[in-house]
Amino acid sequence: MEEIIRVENLTHTYGEGTPFCRSAVQDMSLAIYRGEFLGIIGHTGSGKSTLIQHLNGLLKPTSGRILLGGEDIWADPKKIRNVRFRVGLVFQYPEYQLFEETVYRDIAFGPTNMGLSKDEIDRRVRESAHFAGLTDDLLEKSPFALSGGQKRRAAIAGVIAMEPDVLILDEPTAGLDPAGRESILKNIRDYQAAQQAAVVMVSHSMEEIASNVDRLIVMEKGTAVMTGAPSEVFSHAAELVSMGLNVPCMTQVLLRLQQLGVNVPASAYT
């Protein structure tokens, strides 16, 4: 697989040199590959959000490097803007970031700042709206007139419109009903398949992680303590619980059956 991002010995310390100094990520290394769906889980404060904000240069490492396509993203700080076009980050509750007069203009904001032609911007707006599950009739509406789920889709479309090589999502389904969650995840998978993009998803929903990701990283105290396929990671249920994490409901049932002497596969998790 083609490696698209490499994190080398990343450390990030907040408030360095002050009494409030706190290490959020410690000497962490990982690789992200084109076309893969990577999940990141960890208890609150484990360093997940700090890590993903380094991947597109929103935070600068205290030490270590972030390589995009083999090049250090901070080698030339003047080019960091281009990194953010290639690595799109969707924050938790991104609908609060909508600000334009129409949904169309909001989605077009990123492509416009890339200096693209009007025709190319129009193509990207409409295609990204389609990927995000928005119909054409919504594009001329005010984003503030949309439902909560539609706002979430518009915000995701605004990042997808830049056609990033890597799409990073922090709790993309938070606050949505079950149908809305599954619909959003399907849209993300559709984009990944069409663009062969890497997708990185942070989530507290173990069911969503188990059902969607190819590879999973477990973070604790600022570093990766477990990495592997979901079947491999969730087979260590006791360790995950000791970190304050849940495991998928089906995994809990199967583990209990194993404890009762029933022969069930340890790798089943959904």
Where are these regions (language model features)?
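Conserved ABC ATPase signature
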Residues: 142-146, 150
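Conserved catalytic motifs of ABC-family nucleotide-binding domains
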Residues: 163
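Catalytic Walker B motif of ABC-type/P-loop ATPase nucleotide-binding domains
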Residues: 167-170
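Conserved ABC ATPase "signature" C-loop
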Residues: 221-222
